Amino acid sequence: MDYDFKVKLTGERERVEDLFEYEGCKVGRGTYGHVYKAKRKDGRDDRDYALKQIEGTGISMSACREIALLRELKHPNVISLQKVFLSHADRKVWLLFDFAEHDLWHIIKFHRASKANKKPVQLPRGMVKSLLYQILDGIHYLHANWVLHRDLKPANILVMGEGPERGRVKIADMGFARLFNSPLKPLADLDPVVVTFWYRAPELLLGARHYTKAIDIWAIGCIFAELLTSEPIFHCRQEDIKTSNPYHHDQLDRIFNVMGFPADKDWEDIKKMPEHSTLIKDFRRNTYTNCSLIKYMEKHKVKPDSKTFHLLQKLLTMDPIKRISSEQAMQDPYFLEDPLPTSDVFAGCQIPYPKREFLTEEEPDDKGDKKNQQQQQGNNHTNGTGHPGNQDNSHAQGPPLKKVRVVPPTTTSGGLIMTSDYQRSNPHAAYQNPGPSTSQPQSSMGYSSTSQQPPQYSHQTHRY
């Protein structure tokens, strides 16, 4: 390259430090890099942005793949990549996203902490419905464009804070996302282990090579159950995850303890699964005779004859062929009964969810010492950046206390957003203008994101 042209190009290249103010505003840290809350220096707008600095120098093929996908995907419920900055001097890569003040992991953690403090604040049913509908809408868009997310979990479901998009869900962390219309190799050959254990579909645990978009639907079912109960439905202790073998005895045992062992008539192709022989050797059907999703959800006061349970059952169908699709789920009767889903998931909600906290340079992210924690995700996890994931998934200890930024309680009122193409086919299920508040009153406990909770659930991290 001509030297003078190279010098000119370097001078014209936009530098992230010239455009954005972000010093002292770190909100996330991991082996994938650092995430900062940022604002424009020129005051062109007053929006908050998320700046992710990818760890290391240069850019990997996996990160290139994620960036290429995000540049093409445009949907209200999928995180928007605004810009990519490449620093020529130090070869650092910065990604600019919309900033989301909340995510489902912290929202669920808030409610779980309230239960632990003996003053439970239930997640409003209307909010659960709105969250689920928007997640399905975003995933339907991805699936319609031949994209599998493959790592859906509460930490990857962001929710926008105050602003024009308040209360809107944003599906984030596309580091594991893949096109599935015509892969050159079976997806299982490219990535033998995908999806965080607790949200991993049974066909993945049994070694399915040609898995489908049904794996995302199972994960959504797990998230739905967690929203209803404030507890991970298939929580289990973690083992060594460095192996590329997808088979996981304890995770299957947990699924069977909730769902029961699948009957041959309910999942005819289970005998074709690569790990079926191991399954038969390790498990006995009669061990789980008294286990069922009905019994599990009844303990959490979800009635088996309710539309809520019927949809959950369709999402958590063991046979991937029989599992409901995202489009079918959006048309389910559950979304046609009051309260109807809204564009602002916080509509009518008076619960003071805490904002994201700023981290100091010496302060770890809220998962504690990684060396003392069990690892939950495969060592191929990229955290959406193409670099090894933050293996900070604690099962043995809870998050350490951090410096808390005190935030005042907020009340919410939502507005109508434009209906997506997929909603137009089912106008009755489209977002509704929220009416007066019917949700639970604001808690006086003043919970923050450092509230104590059962440590076995402290396994997530901030994602973009």
UniProtKB/Swiss-Prot annotation:
Ranges for region Interaction with CCNC: 1-15
SUPFAM superfamilies, per database record: Protein kinase-like (PK-like)
Compositionally biased residues, Polar residues: 409-426, 434-446
Transcription regulation keyword on record: yes
Residues the record lists as binding ATP: 27-35, 52
Domain of life the protein comes from: Eukaryota
Biased composition, class Low complexity, residue ranges: 373-391, 447-464
Residue ranges crossing the lipid bilayer per the database entry: none
Annotated GO MF terms: ATP binding; cyclin-dependent protein serine/threonine kinase activity; protein kinase activity; protein serine kinase activity; RNA polymerase II CTD heptapeptide repeat kinase activity
Gene3D superfamilies in the record: Phosphorylase Kinase, domain 1 (3.30.200.20), Transferase(Phosphotransferase) domain 1 (1.10.510.10)
Enzyme Commission no: 2.7.11.22, 2.7.11.23
Residue ranges of the region described as Disordered: 361-464
InterPro entries given in the database record: CDK (IPR050108), Kinase-like_dom_sf (IPR011009), Prot_kinase_dom (IPR000719), Protein_kinase_ATP_BS (IPR017441), Ser/Thr_kinase_AS (IPR008271)
Residues at the catalytic site: 151 (proton acceptor)
Principal location: nucleus
Reactions listed under catalytic activity: L-seryl-[protein] + ATP = O-phospho-L-seryl-[protein] + ADP + H(+); L-threonyl-[protein] + ATP = O-phospho-L-threonyl-[protein] + ADP + H(+); [DNA-directed RNA polymerase] + ATP = phospho-[DNA-directed RNA polymerase] + ADP + H(+)
Any one Gene Ontology cellular component term annotated for this protein: nucleus
Family statement drawn from the similarity comment of this UniProt entry: Belongs to the protein kinase superfamily. CMGC Ser/Thr protein kinase family. CDC2/CDKX subfamily.
Role according to the record: Component of the Mediator complex, a coactivator involved in regulated gene transcription of nearly all RNA polymerase II-dependent genes. Mediator functions as a bridge to convey information from gene-specific regulatory proteins to the basal RNA polymerase II transcription machinery. Mediator is recruited to promoters by direct interactions with regulatory proteins and serves as a scaffold for the assembly of a functional pre-initiation complex with RNA polymerase II and the general transcription factors.
Name recorded for this polypeptide: Cyclin-dependent kinase 8
Organism name: Xenopus tropicalis (Western clawed frog)
